[in-house]
Each structure stands twice: as structure tokens, then as C-alpha cells.
């Protein structure tokens, strides 16, 4: 007869809650992605001229949604594990968006660029670790 393991039960329940929350989040993000696609198409075919910053910001927000959805897909495909490099990709993309949208203060822009450099170095180190495993 199997004994009841409370630790395993709690972990299983929490894993189910996390999975359901991530599925709901992926549905919401997919809706936002579709909305961003429609907005992007409207920018392209609109007679009104939008600034290139607005268009580039729209594209980067689109990729942020896309990266978060890809991260959730990877979570389920890799046995409930979030790979570090996907978070780094999202961080780099978000910082690039910040530089494009908010570039009035040179010192802030320099700090964002430095943060991107740190993330790229972290990505390189992470990838080197993965290459050594192979």
C-alpha cells in the first residue's frame, strides 16, 4: 500500500496551479499579440503618417509578446523548466525598447546600454556553460 506523501502532494497541486496560470497567461498574451498585429497592420496601411519611433516601438512590443509566449511554450516542452537565456533575450529586448522610446536623457540611455552589455555577457557565459555540457 502506498503511503501518502504530503510534500509530493503539495508540489503537485502547486505545479498544477502554476500550469493553469501559465496557460491563462499565454491566452491573454496571444490576444495582445493579435491586437498588436492588427495595430501594426493599421500603421502600415494608414494614410496618417506615424513617426518611425512609434512603428519601431510597436514592432518591439510585438516581439516582447512573442518572446513571452515562446518562453511559456519552452517551459512546457522542457519538462517545466524556464531556460535562463529566454529571460535574457526578453531583458535585452525590453531595454532596447526603453532606449528607443525614452532617449531624452543621455545618462539613462548610457545606463540602459550598459545593462544590455551586461545581459549580452551573461548570455555568452550561459551559452558557454551549455556548450561545455555537450
From Swiss-Prot:
One of its GO terms (biological process) is cellular response to phosphate starvation. The chain crosses the membrane at residues 14-34, 56-76, 82-102, 106-126. Keywords: Cell membrane, Membrane, Transmembrane, Transmembrane helix. GO terms for cellular component: plasma membrane. It is a multi-pass membrane protein. It is found in: Cell membrane. Pfam families: PsiE. It comes from the Bacteria. InterPro entries: P_starv_induced_PsiE, P_starv_induced_PsiE-like. NCBIfam families: PRK02833.1-3. HAMAP family: PsiE. Belongs to the PsiE family. PANTHER family: PROTEIN PSIE (PTHR37819:SF1). This is Protein PsiE homolog.
Amino acid at each position: 500500500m502506498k503511503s501518502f506523501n504530503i510534500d509530493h502532494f503539495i508540489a503537485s497541486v502547486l505545479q498544477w496551479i502554476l500550469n493553469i496560470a501559465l496557460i491563462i497567461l499565454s491566452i491573454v498574451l496571444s490576444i495582445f499579440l493579435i491586437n498588436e498585429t492588427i495595430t501594426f497592420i493599421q500603421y502600415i496601411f494608414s494614410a496618417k503618417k506615424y513617426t518611425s519611433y512609434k512603428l519601431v516601438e510597436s514592432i518591439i512590443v510585438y516581439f516582447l509578446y512573442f518572446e513571452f509566449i515562446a518562453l511559456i511554450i519552452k517551459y512546457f516542452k522542457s519538462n517545466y523548466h524556464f531556460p535562463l537565456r529566454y529571460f535574457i533575450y526578453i531583458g535585452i529586448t525590453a531595454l532596447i525598447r526603453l532606449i528607443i522610446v525614452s532617449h531624452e536623457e543621455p545618462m539613462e540611455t548610457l545606463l540602459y546600454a550598459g545593462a544590455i552589455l551586461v545581459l549580452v555577457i551573461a548570455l555568452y557565459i550561459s551559452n558557454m556553460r551549455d556548450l561545455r555540457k555537450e
